[in-house]
């Protein structure tokens, strides 16, 4: 018989840097998950992407076991990295803080494609352009 799902936990954790401190510890502790076991598995799986924020969905079962799925980094994080910025604009409609090319947008869209709700690469690129616009980043080309 299949295990009964007790809940889902969605977190955004820096790759290779999960530790029992907040926000990871309290979120997993509420569901009774072995926090250190999750941290070890997550850090091992995301070691190669260190420094990037990785969204993770943890499925908790009734016997306190868990599985987790890592997603692609948020589009905003990828855009900031491509544009070479620290963060997006506080006033995106007035202050433009950086520029990305159409090729960079395509690269991000191809990376994000599995997690985006888009049928083709053009639809995914349109979503990435919208994210860039809302961050005060100009798309050239």
Swiss-Prot record:
Reported modifications of this chain: One or more lysine residues are methylated.
Residue runs in coiled coils: none
This protein's record includes keyword ATP-binding: no
Quaternary structure and partners: Part of the ribosomal stalk of the 50S ribosomal subunit. Interacts with L10 and the large rRNA to form the base of the stalk. L10 forms an elongated spine to which L12 dimers bind in a sequential fashion forming a multimeric L10(L12)X complex.
Protein's UniProt keywords contain Acetylation: no
Pfam families xrefs: Ribosomal_L11, Ribosomal_L11_N
Function: Forms part of the ribosomal stalk which helps the ribosome interact with GTP-bound translation factors.
Organism of this sequence: Chlorobium phaeobacteroides (strain BS1)
InterPro entries: Ribosomal_uL11 (IPR000911), Ribosomal_uL11_bac-typ (IPR006519), Ribosomal_uL11_C (IPR020783), Ribosomal_uL11_C_sf (IPR036769), Ribosomal_uL11_N (IPR020784), Ribosomal_uL11_N_sf (IPR036796)
Superkingdom as given in the UniProt entry: Bacteria
Biological process, per Gene Ontology: translation
Molecular function GO labels: large ribosomal subunit rRNA binding; structural constituent of ribosome
The protein's name in its UniProt record: Large ribosomal subunit protein uL11
Keywords: Methylation, Ribonucleoprotein, Ribosomal protein, RNA-binding, rRNA-binding
NCBIfam families the UniProt entry points to: L11_bact (TIGR01632)
Lineage start: Bacteria, Pseudomonadati, Chlorobiota, Chlorobiia, Chlorobiales
Similarity field: Belongs to the universal ribosomal protein uL11 family.
GO cellular component term of the entry, any: cytosolic large ribosomal subunit
Gene3D superfamilies noted in UniProt: Ribosomal protein L11, C-terminal domain, Ribosomal protein L11/L12, N-terminal domain
């Amino acid at each position: 018989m299949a295990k009964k799902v007790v809940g889902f936990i969605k977190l955004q954790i820096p790759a290779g840097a999960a530790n029992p401190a907040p926000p990871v510890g309290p979120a997993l502790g509420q569901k009774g998950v072995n926090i250190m076991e999750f941290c070890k598995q997550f850090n091992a799986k995301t070691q190669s992407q260190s420094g990037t924020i990785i969204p993770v969905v943890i499925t908790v079962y009734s016997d306190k076991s868990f599985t987790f799925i890592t997603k692609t980094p948020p589009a905003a994080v990828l855009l900031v990295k491509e544009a070479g910025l620290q963060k997006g604009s506080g006033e995106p409609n007035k202050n433009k803080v950086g520029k990305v090319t159409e090729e960079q947008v395509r690269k991000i869209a191809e990376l994000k494609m599995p997690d985006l709700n888009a049928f083709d690469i053009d639809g995914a690129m349109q979503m990435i352009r919208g994210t860039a616009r809302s961050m005060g980043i100009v798309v050239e080309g």
